[in-house]
Regions:
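Second-shell loop/turn segments in exported
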Residues: 2-11, 30-40, 111, 133-139, ...
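Extracellular/luminal Protease-associated
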Residues: 12, 37, 90-185, 363-366
Length: 675
């Protein structure tokens, strides 16, 4: 039996670093990089990774074909005459849209503030390039001003970051998923270059510039997820490791180092002679950054297709997905594993028994939950595969270097990289000594109960609804108690199994393993059921439970009704700003608002991917919001008509809440409480 020390001894972070650097060779844009969904650069990187998997000794190395929308960004250069009279050429970043010029083409450029509907008043943008400021972290995503420009007839929009992302320096370009249609072209420009253009535009109003661009989106392309295996004694039971190999710019941290770490761990396991009980699968995912045109859920396309289309049989067989993102830089003061709730207790217990590992952080490693929609582990989880990821959202990197040309090895932290190698290599070894997937639903039920403690307000919730909420709280608490007792049984089984393996009593261990197949299948079935029925997202991709979203809208709508009946329009508007996607009603035209609402509600599953049926409805408040803004501007305070309209919306949400509780009650009683 291979020991933890043997596995750790064979880890080689220098190998992983070199592999991460090798991935930088493949690029669509010779100046900026980019290795995007369906591009030649992504394909060539996949071919290299396939060869690498074979060379380190993985078995059954294969290319799993998946269909995504493709994007090839070859160039975008802006030429203009500077203030000193000298010709300037600047590199532009790009978003996943289509615009191909015939060499340098002359265009008129105008500056339009933040690119909101109001910024176009009295302006003619038809056929022109529009320069705007944007803060995608604190204000709105790029698709809103881009589509506004498109509707106003602009040839393309050029965005400069005014905060939120790319804060490392004034030369930074930024890239994100566009979440909009491909026929509304968009580019990014550095703060330094935009500042010079703004000075010229202050003098002239409009400026003649020349654009040379080649950026193309093609729908329904084939790309490949690359998989390799270390076969186990139980081929039907798998542990999955995943990381994505597409990137913006050179993508050293996001996500070259993650792919390299995954293969570095694979290489160490093979070299150590580790012979697993479970089959260990290593999957380099394509099309994580973007892969679906004109969709609000346009990222994580490759992972979604891998488990929903290419290998749906993985569900019920894969006991854990260990996903990796940006593992070679320091995120805050400690390493964190971001996990689905069901794995938290197991991970906490496992961390307590770990040997001393590399001291890369001043504080000890912790587990946090739940997983988020930012990475491929969410697609895995909603398919029914329990998942986790090294947490990558702490620290300043996301605001400074993330998705810019400064994502390079200058931020590389060898000690952090080594710690993550050690941590997840040993987690694979620990999971290999389980007979039953160590899931615990207690935290799921405790969160469901805890959210029912929050006050909804006496003015708009009847006594009957209050009684219903208390009944459901007690039911969830009862389910939490049962879930913990069930987990204690699973923990005892796994401890016994691990002990038998350590003693070399493999026959008895195998007998125990086979006896528990039904128990594991049932736990995985219920995990998928819970993901299907409990887990939802709001209009910004944040993870909630179904009833939580209804309750939040009830609080906001009820509060707004109260404010309006008191003549407090500003207070009401602040609440309505938070309802669904109605924040965009304050700044953008109704056609923009309608497009980005309907494309979430009305597109088929293959366009919505992991967001399909994950939202809890929508309240269209556009006419009401714009009307209230006019009343506020005009100094009016009589808003009884608007209050009555919101009362109707409030009633709809109360009905939706009761329906949600009915659904969750049936599932909880049937599947999460001992019968």
């Amino acid at each position: 039996m291979i020991t933890q020390e043997e596995i750790l001894k064979h880890l080689d972070v220098d190998y992983s670093y070199r592999l991460a650097k090798r991935m930088e060779v493949y690029k669509s844009n010779p100046v900026l990089g980019y290795r995007t969904a369906g591009s030649r650069a992504e394909f060539e990187t996949g071919e290299m990774l396939k060869q690498e998997m074979e060379s380190i000794g993985l078995s059954d190395v294969s290319k799993d074909a998946v269909t995504v929308d493709g994007w090839e960004f070859k160039k975008a250069v802006l030429r203009f005459e500077g203030q000193d009279g000298r010709e300037r050429e600047v590199q532009l970043g790009a978003y996943q849209t289509t615009l191909v010029t015939d060499g340098f083409e002359e265009c008129s450029l105008m500056y339009l503030g933040k690119g909101t509907d109001r910024d176009y008043e009295g302006k003619n943008a038809a056929g022109k390039l529009v320069l705007v400021d944007i803060n995608q972290r604190d204000e709105w995503w790029i698709n809103y001003p881009v589509y506004e420009a498109h509707l106003k007839g602009a040839r393309a929009l050029i965005a400069v970051q005014s905060g939120g992302y790319g804060e490392i320096g004034e030369e930074a370009l930024n890239a994100q998923d566009i979440a909009g249609p491909e026929d509304a072209p968009a580019f990014s420009i550095s703060e330094r270059d935009a500042r010079e253009l703004k000075k010229l535009l202050q003098e002239k109003g409009e400026l003649s510039v020349f654009l040379d661009a080649d950026t193309r989106v093609r729908r329904n392309c084939t790309t490949y997820n690359i998989t390799g295996r270390i076969p186990g004694r139980h081929p039907e039971r798998m542990v999955l490791l995943s990381a994505h190999y597409d990137s913006y710019f050179s993508g050293f941290q996001d996500d070259n180092t993650a792919v390299a770490m995954m293969l570095g761990i694979a290489r160490a396991l093979v070299a150590s002679g580790f012979q697993p009980n479970n089959t260990i699968v290593f999957c380099a995912m394509a099309a994580e950054e973007w892969g679906v045109a004109d969709s609000n859920f346009d990222w994580s396309a490759g992972a979604y297709e891998q488990v929903f289309t290419a290998h749906p049989e993985w569900v019920g067989r894969v006991i854990a997905d260990l996903n990796f993102e940006l593992p070679a830089l320091a995120h805050g003061t400690r390493a964190r594993i971001r996990s689905c709730y069901e794995y938290v207790d197991y991970l906490n217990e496992w961390l307590e028994d770990l040997p001393n590992l590399t001291q890369a952080y001043p504080e000890e490693t912790k587990v946090t939950a739940p997983i988020e929609t930012w990475s491929d582990d969410f697609s895995m989880a909603i398919a029914g595969i329990p998942s986790m990821v090294n947490d990558f959202t702490g620290g300043s990197f996301m605001e400074t270097h993330y998705h810019s040309q400064f994502d390079n090895d200058e931020f590389y932290d060898e000690q952090v990289n080594r710690l993550h190698h050690e941590l997840f290599a040993l987690l694979i070894e620990a999971l290999d000594r389980t007979a039953v997937v160590p899931l615990c639903f207690e935290r799921v039920m405790k969160r469901a109960a805890r959210s029912l403690d929050e006050e909804l307000g006496e003015l708009w919730v009847s006594p009957e609804v209050a009684v219903r909420l208390e009944e459901m709280k007690q039911l969830f608490e009862q389910a939490a108690e049962f879930s913990w007792r069930e987990y204690e049984e699973v923990r005892e089984i796994n401890n016994r199994y691990s002990s038998l393996l350590s003693q070399g009593r493999e026959a008895q261990a195998e007998e125990l393993f086979q006896r528990e197949r039904k128990r594991e299948a049932e736990l995985l079935r219920r995990f998928k059921l819970e993901q299907d029925e409990f887990v939802r997202i709001d209009w910004y991709g944040n993870v909630y439970y179904l009833h939580e979203l209804c309750m939040e809208k009830i609080r906001l709508l009820g509060g707004a009704v109260k404010n309006l009946r008191e003549g407090k329009i500003s207070a009401a508007l602040r609440k309505l700003y938070q309802v669904d996607n109605n924040a965009y009603a304050f700044m953008f035209s109704e056609e923009v608002y309608r497009h980005f609402t309907e494309y979430v509600l009305d597109q088929p599953k293959d366009r919505l991917k992991w967001g399909y049926q994950r939202l809890a409805g929508h309240e269209n408040l556009y006419p009401l919001v714009t009307g209230l803004l006019q009343r506020e501007f005009g100094g009016e305070s009589d808003c009884r008509k608007e209050a009555d309209a919101l009362d109707e919306a409030l009633s709809r949400q109360l009905r939706a809440l009761l329906d949600a509780l009915d659904t969750l009650e049936k599932i909880t009683k049937k599947d999460f409480i001992q019968r």
